[in-house]
Amino acid sequence: MLGEVSKILAKSSMAIAFTGAGISAESGIPTFRGKDGLWRKYRAEELATPEAFKRDPKLVWEFYKWRIKKILEAKPNPAHIALAELEKMGIIKAVITQNVDDLHREAGSKNVIELHGNIFRVKCTSCSYREYLKESDRIGWLLSQELPRCPKCGSLLRPDVVWFGEALPEKELTTAFSLAKKADVVLVVGTSGVVYPAAYIPYIVKESGGIVVEINIEPSAITPIADFFLRGKAGEVLPKLVEEIRRISK
C-alpha cells in the first residue's frame, strides 16, 4: 500500500497535507484529546474561551504560558521534516494545519495555512494590533508576571488562536477550502476529524475527485472516506514515503 501511495504522490500535480494534533503529539506536545491530553489535567474547554478570558485573563494566560513552554521544549519530528521535504520536492503544495505550535515552519515548510491561529502570535482585544513573538523575545515574555498589554491602545493582549465558540479566520479557511477543491491528493495526518469546519477538508478533496490518504495510529472519523489508510506513527510512515518517492523518481 505504501508503494501504491508513493506512486500516486509522485504523479500528483496538486497534493496537499492536512494535519492535526497527532503529528505534534509525536514531538511531545500534549493534545486536547486522548488519555494523555490536556483534558485530563485542565478542563481546557473552560479555559480556551472568550468568556474565561473576560472572567480571569490571568488564569488563561497562565494556561497558555504553560502551553507555550511545552511547545518551546518540543522540536519538529521526522513527520514534520518529511512534509517539508515533500514540499521541496514539489509534491506538496501546502500544509493546512489545525495546530498552533509553528512546528511545520520550524521544520522548513513554507506554505503553511494555520486554521486555528498561532500560539506565538498575540492580538489586541480592542484594536487591530497583532504581533508575532520573535524567538529572542519568547523566554523574557514567558517570565513576565504582568498581563501583556497592547502597545497601541493599552488593552489586554490575548493569544491569537481560535478559542471554543469562535469562528475560524476567514482568509485562511477560504484558502484551505480553495486548495482542497483543486487538490488531487490529500495526506490526512494525525487528526481525529471531528473538529469542524476544518474537518470538511478531506471531504471537499474527495467530492472534487481527489484521493484521500490517511496516516494515523488508529482509525478516525475520516477513515470511512479514505482511499488509503496507512496505520502507524506519522514520524515513521512519512519518511518511508519520501524515501520510496525518491527511489521511484530516479
From Swiss-Prot:
The active site is at residue 116. InterPro entries: DHS-like_NAD/FAD-binding_dom (IPR029035), NAD-dep_sirtuin_deacylases (IPR050134), Sirtuin (IPR003000), Sirtuin_cat_small_dom_sf (IPR026591), Sirtuin_class_III (IPR027546), Ssirtuin_cat_dom (IPR026590). Zn(2+) binds at residues 124, 127, 150, 153. 2 residues (Tyr-64 and Arg-67) present in a large hydrophobic pocket are probably involved in substrate specificity. They are important for desuccinylation activity, but dispensable for deacetylation activity. CDD domains: SIRT5_Af1_CobB (cd01412). It is found in: Cytoplasm. It is an enzyme of class 2 (transferase). It comes from Pyrococcus furiosus (strain ATCC 43587 / DSM 3638 / JCM 8422 / Vc1). GO terms for molecular function: histone deacetylase activity, NAD-dependent; NAD+ binding; protein-malonyllysine demalonylase activity; protein-succinyllysine desuccinylase activity; zinc ion binding. Residues 1-248 form the Deacetylase sirtuin-type domain. Binds 1 zinc ion per subunit. The keyword Membrane does not apply. NCBIfam families: PRK00481.1-3, prot_deacyl_CobB. It holds the Pfam family SIR2. This is NAD-dependent protein deacylase. GO terms for cellular component: cytoplasm.
